[in-house]
From Swiss-Prot:
GO terms for cellular component: cytoplasm. Belongs to the dihydroorotate dehydrogenase family. Type 1 subfamily. CDD domains: DHOD_1B_like. The active site is at residue 132. Catalyzes the conversion of dihydroorotate to orotate with NAD(+) as electron acceptor. This is Dihydroorotate dehydrogenase B (NAD(+)), catalytic subunit. Its cofactor is FMN. Keywords: Cytoplasm, Flavoprotein, FMN, NAD, Oxidoreductase, Pyrimidine biosynthesis.
Length: 307
């Protein structure tokens, strides 16, 4: 293994950096900027059973230290993802493990999509999105209720043929309760944090700046919240965490790993700089040299032993 390599259920990664779902499309959108094979993995855009048009515009607005978004899980649906999106990645980047993000209105939706999408040859794991704050039906209910999160996870684990990661919402009183419930239900790993629900108002119009009124807050402003929640979750569950939330630099990525994350998702940074992920990857080893970190697996071991 190289210094940057990390291993998680279903994922033997050359490095821990991956674009977070919803911030990188299905990969082809960024392939014109750099060779995607440099990435550890790609968490592709959420897939639902049927196509979704998403929320009305305006969907995105800048905020101090970040952005609000209310995309509404726009995607072409399972059939198109299986017939076009995943095969394109398999053809052009055959050695790149894909994490397929899955969303739905009902347990049956999640189960059906996971059953099918986990059969794609390049899908190494599925990430079930129980935490999106923008959809008026389904997701947020699963993500904020201990019993619902447990039962959904249990159903998906039984249906999927690859490891299952559960994406947790920060919009809860105690994220460790949801983490324990999904781990007890058989989740192979967790991803956190998703966006925090926020709102801004246009003073001249006296209306919210985005059409959905509320949206998910992301970007550098949420990094300290991500650090706190990753630290809390990794102290109460034994399954690995892919950390995300406000990562803009190599130092941010290492900070999440020092908080307990085993790998790192990069979201909003991809919008401000299409080359954000390779820049973060390239900056890791020099920073590790400065901090006397022999390898990321050594760092993971040290963090676990310090608990």
């Amino acid at each position: 293994m190289t210094r940057l390599a990390v291993s998680l259920p279903g994922l033997n990664l050359k490095n821990p950096i991956m674009p977070a779902s919803g911030c990188f499309g299905f990969g082809a959108e960024y392939a014109e900027y750099y060779d995607l094979s440099v990435l550890g993995s790609i968490m592709v855009k959420a897939t639902t059973l049927e196509p979704r048009r998403g929320n009305p515009v305006i969907r995105v607005a800048e905020t101090p230290g970040g952005m609000l978004n209310a995309i509404g899980l726009q995607n072409p649906g399972l059939d198109v993802v299986m017939a076009e999106k995943l095969p394109w990645l398999a053809e052009h980047f055959p050695d790149l493990p894909i994490i397929a993000n899955v969303a739905g209105y009902t347990t049956e939706d999640y189960v059906r999509v996971c059953e099918v999408i986990s059969t794609a040859p390049n899908v190494a794991a599925v990430e079930i999105n129980i935490s999106c704050p923008n959809v008026k039906r389904g997701g947020i209910t699963f993500g904020t209720n201990v019993t619902a999160a447990h039962d959904l996870t249990q159903a998906v684990v039984a249906a999927a043929s690859v490891p299952v990661y559960v994406k947790l919402s920060p919009n809860v009183t105690d994220i460790t309760e949801i983490a324990r419930a999904t781990a007890d239900a058989g989740a192979d790993g967790l991803t956190l944090i998703n966006t925090l629900t926020g709102m801004r108002i246009n003073l001249a119009r006296r209306t919210p700046v985005i059409a959905n009124a509320t949206g998910g807050l992301s970007g550098p402003a949420v990094l300290p919240i991500a650090v706190r929640m990753i630290d809390a979750v990794t102290r109460v569950v034994d399954i690995p965490v892919i950390g995300m939330g406000g990562v803009m630099t190599s130092a941010d990525a290492l900070e999440l790993m020092m908080a307990g994350a085993s790998a790192v998702g990069v979201g909003t940074a991809n919008f401000t700089d299409p080359l954000a992920c390779p820049k973060i990857i390239n900056g890791l080893e020099p920073l590790m040299d400065d901090l006397s970190i022999a390898s990321l697996e050594d760092l993971r071991t040290q963090v676990r032993q310090s608990r």
